[in-house]
Amino acid sequence: MNSHLIYPTIEDAIGKTPLVALQRIGAADNAKRGNVILGKLEGNNPAGSVKDRPALSMIQRAQERGDIKPGDTLIEATSGNTGIALAMAAAIKGYRMVLIMPEDLSIERAQTMKAFGAELILTPKSGGMEYARDLAERMQAEGKGRMLDQFANEDNPRIHYETTGPELWEQTQGRITHFVSAMGTTGTITGVSRFLKEKNPAIRIIGAQPSEGSRIPGIRKWPQEYLPKIYDASNVDELVYVSQDDAEDMCRRLAREEGIFAGISAAGACWVAMQIAQQVENATIAFIVCDRGDRYLSTGVFPA
């Protein structure tokens, strides 16, 4: 057995995710234009999403600074993937994890968080993430735990600057021309764009946003909703709006035509990448497949 194939811990398996070229969706048009569309499979991370990276980073670095220690209670407001990733990271590092989120999250996410040992507090869906964040802040003020605050924590985009961005650059051998990401906490797009723009300012950075009246899990419409403090708009060249119907249709197409079992926000980013591909030539367009489709089975996006 080759020892270099053995990871010392599960946290060492986070990152270095595959970058896969789409083969069928838009194939004829892409071949004609000389474009390549690539999906970075962040669902391959141990807890199943791109959020594994910042979750572990926020806990590790807070611990290194002496802000927290194993056995402490951590608090976070989250709509899903960050909660699952934090639950895993807290289990690895020995923390009690309390997650606060709107009550309309999918049952798969809630069950997964509990499987990792996290405690859940559900808030009224009418209050959205703002209500959940306010409650987390109140609990911290009352001394009930330490809030990691993914929306304002610089360790969130920093880990994408240090890992996700360099991986994309290396995997494309510097040929990447466009980067597309859904925008939730904005940690991914902020960190990756910062790295890629340093490498090549000509690389276009595109954020996927829900169109008016659409609700896509994992994507929030900024600045109509709470604008994260970590968001750096200076490196984002364009926002493209995707409807819920188009995102869900692309979700099904990715599974059936490419064999990529992606979540709805990932499919929204793919849809945006396809729109960009219709406007350019000889481009290498990468998008983040931020999680897997099994977290959305109860939503009805996939036919029974």
Task: Please provide the spans of the model-predicted regions.
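PLP-dependent amino-acid enzyme catalytic core
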Residues: 1-304
